Curated annotation (Swiss-Prot):
InterPro entries: YaaA (IPR005583)
Protein name, entry field: UPF0246 protein RSc2009
Protein family membership: Belongs to the UPF0246 family.
Superkingdom in the source lineage: Bacteria
GO cellular component: cytosol
Gene Ontology biological-process entries: response to hydroperoxide
Length: 257
């Protein structure tokens, strides 16, 4: 069983990493191709492309300029410790044990516009490049064209040791589109998190994002390799709703946040 998460736009490179253990991304040379494409853009062009403010555009232009194929303790940080935001607030990787992180290293992957797919302990230099960005590149009109089957094949290589391979999709729709179901040699299960509001259950973005991180943490702490055990997930009041679920879409609900 492999869990996939989306990355986060918010990054934390101020807090020193609490462990030194690290790996390197699998697709550094591919990332370098995208960086070269991004370096050709002015801050104004970056701002227009990514729909971000002028200060953010300048910040990211500088990040692209500084990016290197050499990943060091000074210019990078383990991905799961560098990403911030709602999902990663739920995951709270800074409070996971070293053994927890090693389990995550085997069972968790983070999809990325720049890096393709990351292990939790892969060193990562700061960047902003959302998967849905329409960045024309040597591979085509956007990042889905650029990554092609690469991400899916990397996941297949990881899943091939499982007797009944299952990919648990805790990523957003934008990011999961980089995974090609027809190429993937695994069953896909997508947990959905709903909260009670206005007299009915609905997906509330902030809560749903946090719940994805909470479920990833639950799987790590309980060493879950059989996805069926995820149905026991009960963090922060969620419970599996069998009546609203099917084989591919598992719904978890709670009455009060």
């Amino acid at each position: 069983m492999i869990i996939v998460l989306s990355p986060a736009k918010s990054l934390d490179y101020d807090t020193p990493p609490r462990i030194k253990t690290h790996t390197l991304p699998d697709f550094i040379e591919r990332s370098a191709v995208l960086i070269e494409t991004l370096r050709k853009l002015s801050p104004a062009q970056i701002g227009t492309l990514m729909h971000i403010s002028d200060p953010l555009a300048v910040l990211n232009a500088n990040r692209y300029a500084d990016w290197s194929t050499e990943f060091t303790a000074d210019n990078s940080k383990q991905a799961v410790l560098a990403f911030d935001g709602d999902v990663y607030g739920g995951l709270d990787a800074n409070t996971l044990s070293a053994d927890d992180l090693q389990f995550a290293q085997q069972h968790l992957r983070i999809l990325s516009g720049l890096y393709g797919v990351l292990r939790p302990l892969d060193r990562m230099q700061p960047y902003r490049l959302e998967m849905g960005t329409r960045l024309a590149n040597p591979g085509g009109k956007d990042l889905y064209a650029f990554w092609g089957d690469d991400v899916t094949l990397a996941l297949n290589a990881l899943l091939q040791a499982d007797d009944d391979p299952v990919l648990v999709n805790l990523a957003s729709e934008e990011y999961f589109k980089v995974v090609r179901p027809k190429v993937l040699k695994a069953r896909i299960v997508t947990p959905v998190f709903e909260d009670w509001k206005g007299g009915r259950y609905k997906i509330i973005s902030f809560y749903a994002k946090r719940a994805r991180g909470l479920m990833a943490r639950y799987a790590i702490e309980h060493r879950i390799a059989d996805p069926r055990k995820l149905k026991h997930f009960d963090a922060e009041g969620y419970a599996f709703a069998a009546e609203a679920s099917d084989d591919e879409r598992w719904v978890f609900r709670r009455k009060a946040a």
